[in-house]
Amino acid sequence: MPEFLNPFSGKLPDRKLTLEELIRAIRLDLAAEHEAVHLYMAHADATDHPLARKVLIDIANEERVHAGEFQRLLNLLAPDEANLMAKGAEEVDEMKNKLGL
């Protein structure tokens, strides 16, 4: 998550990212959103303070919206992404059907 110890984490490169580099960066951003959801929900589950739980769950849900935005951008930048994700979903559906669920 935070990279406060890395003095170069906020430094801009001396050139623009290539499309492939941007795609990798967006994948990393997407992973960070999922990690944030996990962290905030774990904190919410670990407390019985009602206001803290409500705020943490609300923030986690906002991160899920961000994840959707990054996923959509990734699908637009890498056209094969949506097809591969759909293939993965089909494989899970096949397993589900074999189990009769």
Can you name each region flagged by the protein language model?
Residues 1-101:
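Iron-associated oxidoreductase/ferritin-like identity signal
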